[in-house]
Amino acid sequence: MITTGNMSSLMQGLLVPMCTYSIVAIGLNLCVGYLGELSIGHAGFMCIGAFTSAAFTKATMDTFTNAGLRFFVALIIGAVCAGIFGFLIGIPVLRLKGDYLAIVTLAFGEIIKNIINVLYVGIDSNGIHFSMKDQMSLGMEPGGKMIISGAMGITGTPRQSTFTIGVILILVTLFVVLNLINSRDGRAIMAIRDNRIA
């Protein structure tokens, strides 16, 4: 439908975010549906992964010239950073259950959103500069490049994600989750949902 012109530009712009949110919904279904824990921190982890991969893409646009390879390296780096933050948040939070787990994970997502809204990051020949005040307080040289511009986010990144890549990632996610559910660990996950004491 895209190549024949039968799809509006609005719908074309919504296809990649729809794929992204489908992947998040699959992960949320694994946590809430199969594990039985009400964790609402997925948006915060998704935010960390997205900003890390976009910042890597923006910072290495001049040095990493192969766009396809840069995209997949950024994807892996974003997933690893989100996983590390998930592990670090999970250490103290795993003792909680029910509404308390939901409150703490929701608070984590809000904290991440508020930090990123005030974060300014730039790069120049002196290195990487951070500020939580404004762009002027970075103290960059005139030829410096902004990576994260506070509430504006990361601007000027190349649009490398496509609907085809999104569908492939949805299928990979479904494959991994279905194999996990049907494995020994998946049966243990569902046993936790059915009987926490066991």
Where are these regions (language model features)?
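Transmembrane alpha-helices and adjacent helix-loop boundaries
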Residues: 1-198
